[in-house]
Amino acid sequence: MGTFFRVCLALLACWLGYGPARAETRVALVIGNGAYANKAVLPNPTNDAEDVAAALRRSNFEVILGTNLGQSQMQEVAIRFARAAAKADVAMFYYSGHAMQHNGVNYLMPVDARLDDEADLKRFTRVDDIVSDLQQAKNLRILVLDSCRDNPLAEDLKRSGRTRSGSVGRGLSKMEAPLGTIISFSTQAGRT
């Protein structure tokens, strides 16, 4: 597990008062996508997700863990998470894998992703939708994106000529955190 994760988990443990003393309801969705069908495999996301899930369980989170999820599986766990977040005091979302921005909107990539044109983005998970799901938690909402942002599918889309010039940007777009929400990126917005 990299330094970024260790720092995030240490801060999270301090913030939440590590251990069983608190009676808060805590839920987390942890996704690690690395076994991409159409591009090179990323070796770390699955291990990172499992490490984060274990640390969150030690902090009394109910964890929904998904690794190497396709489109339908990502939708299923996101719906399950939204329902759990609505009943939680604290909700956290952690993602490791490919992500990209298009027209200022951030997307998470399922392992069965194809990106032949802009219409295919409907099959990706919008980060804004996850943030909306997080907002249902009563007290604290945490979004951690440790994504590989040098997205090879975005390059395919640019080369295909089936997108407007400049609509696929570097890295992820900057996000404003709603009140009571912590958003953490592994790099600055717009960087890979």
What does each model-identified segment do?
Residues 1-3:
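N-terminal secretory signal peptides that target proteins for export/translocation
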Residues 24-26, 61, 138-140, 179-181:
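Short glycine-/polar-rich loops that comprise or flank the Walker A/P-loop
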Residues 45, 49-50, 56, 66, ...:
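Active-site-proximal C-terminal subdomain of hydrolase catalytic domains
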Residues 29-61, 80:
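N-terminal targeting signals for Sec/Tat export/insertion, comprising classic cleavable signal peptides
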Residues 6-17:
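Bacterial N-terminal signal peptides
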Residues 18-23:
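Sec/Tat signal peptide C-region and signal peptidase I cleavage site
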Residues 25, 69-96, 100-158:
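Caspase-like (clan CD) cysteine peptidase catalytic core
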Residues 35-43, 62-68, 115-121, 192:
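Second-shell loop/turn segments in exported
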